[in-house]
Amino acid sequence: MIIKTLEEYNNVNSIDHGEKIVVFKIGTEWCEPCKTLQTTLEKFDDIVIYNMDMENEVFQSFYEENHILNIPYCICKYENVVFRFKGLLSEESLKDKFTFLRLT
């Protein structure tokens, strides 16, 4: 799902996703590592992916406040725990991060 406004982002943040990890993936359509990361994330059945476009000016203040300068960038949330990472991670690395996130 693509998030196009801050209101949509806030609404999604307030939804109870149960046992699923919520991943906000920030990137662009032209970014090859972003596409690769998307494909890797889609292999996980226990996450929900929301995409945000780095070039969407609506989010510029959000990106600045959160010091998001590079893509791909992900904000992963599980219950009250937040994990962030930038760049491309392997499937195994993501699996380890998601397991750790659930145990925290």
Locations of regions flagged by a protein language model:
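Structural signal for short hydrophobic segments within the conserved structured cores
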Residues: 1, 48-50, 82-86
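Residues at alpha-helix caps and immediate loop-helix transition turns in enzyme cores, especially N-
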Residues: 36-37, 90
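Non-catalytic, surface beta->alpha helical segment in thiol-disulfide oxidoreductase systems
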Residues: 70-104
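N-terminal leader/targeting and pre-domain segments
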Residues: 1-22, 96-104
